[in-house]
């Protein structure tokens, strides 16, 4: 098995958009159910949501600015590391993600193995 990162972008019902609402609770349950199924199948490795605030450090002068400055539908809300046999398998795993119910998207990226 190889490791892949699923990067979650956009979505209308992220916890930071709908905290305390019925939509947020329903959305969170869908995510938990999906991730639990990945755990049972041996695909789940790790995950963390991201807060919508941050800083950017840019260029050779290392200029720091508030960020991220992206369109809402491109905001990275979190990521998930999965085990999959290949990228096609990882893409199939991503298709079960609840973010598609929120008009979001998933970027699937292979994680490069590194010797330390």
Predicted regions and their residues:
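Conserved, structured core segments of small domains
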Residues: 1-116
């Amino acid at each position: 098995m190889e490791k892949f990162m699923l990067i979650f972008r956009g979505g209308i019902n992220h916890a930071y958009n709908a905290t305390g609402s019925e939509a947020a609770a329903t959305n969170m349950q869908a995510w938990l159910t999906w991730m639990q199924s990945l755990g049972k199948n041996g695909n789940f490795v790790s995950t963390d949501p991201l807060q919508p605030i941050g800083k950017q450090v840019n260029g050779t002068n290392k200029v720091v600015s508030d960020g991220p400055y992206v369109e809402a539908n491109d905001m990275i809300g979190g990521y998930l590391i999965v085990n999959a046999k290949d990228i096609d398998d990882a893409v199939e795993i991503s298709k079960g993600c609840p973010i598609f119910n929120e008009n979001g998207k998933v970027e699937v990226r292979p994680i490069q193995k590194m010797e330390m």
